[in-house]
């Protein structure tokens, strides 16, 4: 119970951010006009920024056709083919309305008498032997161990976006069928996969290492806090005071944005005592 209470308290840290009036690129603006550099990026969903114009235009065009409902769509196949370009060994694709539906499907597939299947996060620690399911995050080096199930964190900046599960091996064919989801949202997911290649042209090690320091252990663009769990809320609040938002969940990951100035990250170095 104490552990659950601590997790709840950490998730509530985001409530300490003043009301957000707008979000643009990699910044949040509160109702007073103060700007915050966002290193949380909605857990990775906002890796393209909070307002990727091309992606949002495609979604808007689908909405204008009335395709906001949960309908069958050829976009399911397009999404599977796009994912096949980045995860060729995990060709069994399921699309679920939300993470709760995905985890329920995963639990049903793994067996009713098995404990809940946790999703390992390679941004926090390398995937070890025996891991059944893990998140897949862009811009991380290949993992030595490939679990049977991967859940891609796709950069579609919407909390209501569907989530995708990719499996490999004959047993993964027994995964529960996909949910019907809005073709408009599927359009956003397809576009987000293709956008990763374009982002790679301007987002890499030279940029990521600019935030290196004693506060973090970095894997690619992902930052794992080095402090103890009991110290994390204090770190979150101190950075919030100087205009930086990090992941409200310990130990992260926080994420290096694709656009920032040297001045914006000076508080990170000052806080680390550099």
Where are these regions (language model features)?
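Conserved PLP phosphate-binding loop immediately N-terminal to the Schiff-base lysine helix
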Residues: 103, 118-153
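Active-site-adjacent loop/helix segments that line or gate small-molecule/cofactor pockets in enzymes
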Residues: 1-27, 47, 76, 82, ...
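Short, acidic, Ser/Thr-enriched surface-loop or helix-capping motifs
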Residues: 30-31
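Conserved C-terminal alpha-helix-loop-beta "cap" of PLP-dependent enzymes
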Residues: 34, 127-130, 134, 140-144, ...
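Active-site nucleophile and cofactor-binding loops and adjacent substrate-binding regions
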Residues: 70-77, 93-100, 153-155
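Short loop-beta-helix segment that forms the pyridoxal 5′-phosphate
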Residues: 84-121
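Active-site C-terminal subdomain of aminotransferase-like
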Residues: 136-230
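Glycine-rich phosphate-binding segment of PLP-dependent enzymes
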Residues: 36-37, 41-74, 81-93
